[in-house]
Each structure stands twice: as structure tokens, then as C-alpha cells.
Amino acid sequence: MKLEKLPEEFVQAQPVLEKISEHGFEAYFVGGSVRDVLLGREIHDVDIATSAYPEEIKDIFPYTIDVGIEHGTVLVLAGKSEAEHYEITTFRTESKYTDYRRPDHVDFVRDLREDLKRRDFTVNAFACDFEGQIIDLFDGLTDLKERRLTAVGSALERFNEDALRIMRAMRFASTLDFKIEEKTFSAMRERSHLLEKISVERIFIELDKLLLGSEWRNGLTLLIESEAWKYLPDFQDLALKKVLTELSVDFHFKNSEQAWAALLTRFSNIDVKVFLRKWKVSNEFSKYVADLVSAYELENWDLVSLYHFGLEKALLVDELKIAFGRDIDRERAVFINDQLQIHDKSEIVIAGKDLMDEFSLKPGPELGKILKTIEEKIVKNELKNEQIAILTEVKKMLELEK
């Protein structure tokens, strides 16, 4: 088949493919970008594959960067903007995958079929020339029409080569609403133990995308049915089942933090920060999720808790509570937030230096205690956030200590 109209991203890259062709080599758009064009989805990355070897690409284009030349990839700087920088990879075959993630060795080839047959799924094994002609060597168009994910060739071999493909399949089931072809799913289940060989950082990325997909329930169901959950750090299948059965069917997560918090509210005997440490997430992400889980346990918002967690987290938590069927006052968080004089201690009109100057105080525990007390009183609306009111209050506190 031929595309009626090339997407703008392909049109912009057309001269690159044409130039390679003018030098006697083949060049195609490949991978997920072609799939997304056929699905009418937004393109994120334009990948180009060619029969030209890396050194030949460098001879054709004056401005290039070696970004992965040992694997056949050269970055071509076709223009000044980053959008005009293209990774061009030579057709290749791959040897065994000792680490179940990356090939031990690659060989450059001139044959497009040899390159495409090493790809993960048929819907990712399309090629498209600069005129929009689609090359489909593995019946991917049929799978695309049926919204079916089928491994290219032997599914067992594909997952042996790269076990992360198991998580990618689940992610596609979530983000693209694809079902998994029977033999492909059977191979996923049989090879799920190989996920232990994959870094948790890479698994996290795929699982995170799964959770944010429009059909995340499909993805989580596959995670359970494939038994892949057993090989993820500290995962509990009962918790996953609870999320599927207890969360309202039409709920979609606002962000990653909310999604992971939803899972963790259903885990038993879990220390959120210890759990997330095993997933090697950032401290910022870990704290955010831990805050959401802690806030979820609160019965109601008050001035102190709203100040501590902030309105953004409060609203995310309230969405989860409602989605899990808890009866809450939907307007309370905003109402309480409006009653707060400050939302951060930096908004207090007087700083420690002001108190040191006014009362001849020195830095130390006493000053810290005074500042903390002032902050608490302002939050509870027991003290106005005004200079005279605060100085008067501090004076009283110091007199009581004499």
C-alpha cells in the first residue's frame, strides 16, 4: 500500500532519504513511526534504516556524529534545528544476546528483509520509502487492522533476544489497545523469568507507560496472566488484582506518581520508600508517591495536612479516593486551601534574621523552635501572617521562657 499523504515529520526528512538513494543505496522510515502514521497517531521519533554502511553515510553527509557507530547508527545533522537531526542505522543482523537485552555482535547487511526480521513485532516491522510506499514483509498490516500484537518469526527467539520486549508487549496492549496473539503470549509467559536479567530502570519505564495508557487495565491483566509480576521487585499479584477490581472502570491516571500511589495503596506490609528504592527511581519521585500514599490514609483534610501535602497532591489523592469508592467531600481540599494564609514557609513575612536582629537571638535550636512554632500558628490561623503580630507573639514566647 501507499500512504495518501506523508506526515510532516516524514516530509521534512524526505531530502535525507532522497540523498541516500541518489548515491545508490536504499533508505526507509522504519519502526514505530511508520506504525503510528498508519494508526493516525502522533509521531515521536523518526527512525531511518539504510543499506549504506556507517562510513558511507558519513561520506554522503558533511555533518555527522557517531552516536552508536558500532551498532551501525550515525546521527546526521541535516539542518540547524534538533528536529532536523536524524539517527540513521545500517541494515543489520545480530548474534546471540548473552545479557537478554543487547546483541553481543552485529553484522551490517544490504538486505532490508534481514534487518526487519530481527524486529520485535510485526506492527513495528514496516518500512516506508520517501514516496510513502509501505513495505510489509510479515503481514503486519493485517495485525494492525485486527489490533493484534504478533512477534516477528519465532516469539520465543524474540523474547530470548530481548526480554524487555515482554514488558513492551504489555505496554502496547495498554497504549494502543492491542490484544496479544496466542503464540506470542504463550512465549511471553514462558520467558517471563528472563525479566530478572533486565535492569529495573528499563522495566520501570515500560511499566510506567503501561499505567498511563488508555487501556492500562489490559496491560495489568497481562502482567498478572503472564506471571511476569513475579519477577518485578516486591510486586504482589493480589494488589494488582485489587486495583483492577476496586478502581472505577473508567478511571485514568493523571500522572505517574498517582498511578504508582494507586498500586501501593493496595500493597500489604509495604514501606513505600523502601519499595521504590528497589526500583531505583529518583528521590523526588519516591517522596511524591510516599506523600500520596500517606495522604490517602487520612480521613479528612484540615489546615495542617493540606499545608503539609499541598493542594496539587490533595486533589490527586481525592481523585483516587473517589475512584476507589470512598465517600468524601469533593470540595473540601479547595475550601481548606483557601483558608490557609501561607502555602509555604517562605511566605512568612518575617525570617530568622529579622528575629535575630529584633531580639538579639543567635542561630541555634531556640531560634529554630520559635520559627517552627510561628509557622504552625500561622497555618492553624492562630496567628496573622503580619510583622507586628508575629513580633508580638515572639516577644510573649521569650517572656514566658524567662
Swiss-Prot record:
<dbReference type="InterPro" id="IPR032828">
    <property type="entry name" value="PolyA_RNA-bd"/>
</dbReference>
<protein>
    <recommendedName>
        <fullName>CCA-adding enzyme</fullName>
        <ecNumber>2.7.7.72</ecNumber>
    </recommendedName>
</protein>
<feature type="binding site">
    <location>
        <position position="171"/>
    </location>
    <ligand>
        <name>ATP</name>
    </ligand>
</feature>
<feature type="binding site">
    <location>
        <position position="119"/>
    </location>
    <ligand>
        <name>CTP</name>
    </ligand>
</feature>
<feature type="binding site">
    <location>
        <position position="165"/>
    </location>
    <ligand>
        <name>CTP</name>
    </ligand>
</feature>
<keyword id="KW-0548">Nucleotidyltransferase</keyword>
<feature type="binding site">
    <location>
        <position position="162"/>
    </location>
    <ligand>
        <name>ATP</name>
    </ligand>
</feature>
<dbReference type="GO" id="GO:0001680">
    <property type="term" value="P:tRNA 3'-terminal CCA addition"/>
</dbReference>
<dbReference type="GO" id="GO:0000287">
    <property type="term" value="F:magnesium ion binding"/>
</dbReference>
<feature type="binding site">
    <location>
        <position position="168"/>
    </location>
    <ligand>
        <name>CTP</name>
    </ligand>
</feature>
<dbReference type="InterPro" id="IPR043519">
    <property type="entry name" value="NT_sf"/>
</dbReference>
<feature type="binding site">
    <location>
        <position position="32"/>
    </location>
    <ligand>
        <name>ATP</name>
    </ligand>
</feature>
<keyword id="KW-0547">Nucleotide-binding</keyword>
<comment type="subunit">
    <text>Homodimer.</text>
</comment>
<feature type="binding site">
    <location>
        <position position="35"/>
    </location>
    <ligand>
        <name>CTP</name>
    </ligand>
</feature>
<feature type="binding site">
    <location>
        <position position="168"/>
    </location>
    <ligand>
        <name>ATP</name>
    </ligand>
</feature>
<dbReference type="InterPro" id="IPR002646">
    <property type="entry name" value="PolA_pol_head_dom"/>
</dbReference>
<feature type="binding site">
    <location>
        <position position="165"/>
    </location>
    <ligand>
        <name>ATP</name>
    </ligand>
</feature>
<feature type="binding site">
    <location>
        <position position="119"/>
    </location>
    <ligand>
        <name>ATP</name>
    </ligand>
</feature>
<keyword id="KW-0479">Metal-binding</keyword>
<comment type="similarity">
    <text>Belongs to the tRNA nucleotidyltransferase/poly(A) polymerase family. Bacterial CCA-adding enzyme type 3 subfamily.</text>
</comment>
<dbReference type="InterPro" id="IPR032810">
    <property type="entry name" value="CCA-adding_enz_C"/>
</dbReference>
<keyword id="KW-0819">tRNA processing</keyword>
<dbReference type="Pfam" id="PF13735">
    <property type="entry name" value="tRNA_NucTran2_2"/>
</dbReference>
<dbReference type="GO" id="GO:0005524">
    <property type="term" value="F:ATP binding"/>
</dbReference>
<feature type="binding site">
    <location>
        <position position="35"/>
    </location>
    <ligand>
        <name>ATP</name>
    </ligand>
</feature>
<dbReference type="GO" id="GO:0042245">
    <property type="term" value="P:RNA repair"/>
</dbReference>
<feature type="binding site">
    <location>
        <position position="47"/>
    </location>
    <ligand>
        <name>Mg(2+)</name>
    </ligand>
</feature>
<dbReference type="GO" id="GO:0004810">
    <property type="term" value="F:CCA tRNA nucleotidyltransferase activity"/>
</dbReference>
<dbReference type="Pfam" id="PF12627">
    <property type="entry name" value="PolyA_pol_RNAbd"/>
</dbReference>
<dbReference type="GO" id="GO:0000049">
    <property type="term" value="F:tRNA binding"/>
</dbReference>
<keyword id="KW-0808">Transferase</keyword>
<feature type="binding site">
    <location>
        <position position="162"/>
    </location>
    <ligand>
        <name>CTP</name>
    </ligand>
</feature>
<dbReference type="InterPro" id="IPR050264">
    <property type="entry name" value="Bact_CCA-adding_enz_type3_sf"/>
</dbReference>
<feature type="binding site">
    <location>
        <position position="32"/>
    </location>
    <ligand>
        <name>CTP</name>
    </ligand>
</feature>
<dbReference type="InterPro" id="IPR023068">
    <property type="entry name" value="CCA-adding_enz_firmicutes"/>
</dbReference>
<keyword id="KW-0694">RNA-binding</keyword>
<dbReference type="Pfam" id="PF01743">
    <property type="entry name" value="PolyA_pol"/>
</dbReference>
<keyword id="KW-0692">RNA repair</keyword>
<feature type="binding site">
    <location>
        <position position="171"/>
    </location>
    <ligand>
        <name>CTP</name>
    </ligand>
</feature>
<comment type="function">
    <text>Catalyzes the addition and repair of the essential 3'-terminal CCA sequence in tRNAs without using a nucleic acid template. Adds these three nucleotides in the order of C, C, and A to the tRNA nucleotide-73, using CTP and ATP as substrates and producing inorganic pyrophosphate. tRNA 3'-terminal CCA addition is required both for tRNA processing and repair. Also involved in tRNA surveillance by mediating tandem CCA addition to generate a CCACCA at the 3' terminus of unstable tRNAs. While stable tRNAs receive only 3'-terminal CCA, unstable tRNAs are marked with CCACCA and rapidly degraded.</text>
</comment>
<keyword id="KW-0067">ATP-binding</keyword>
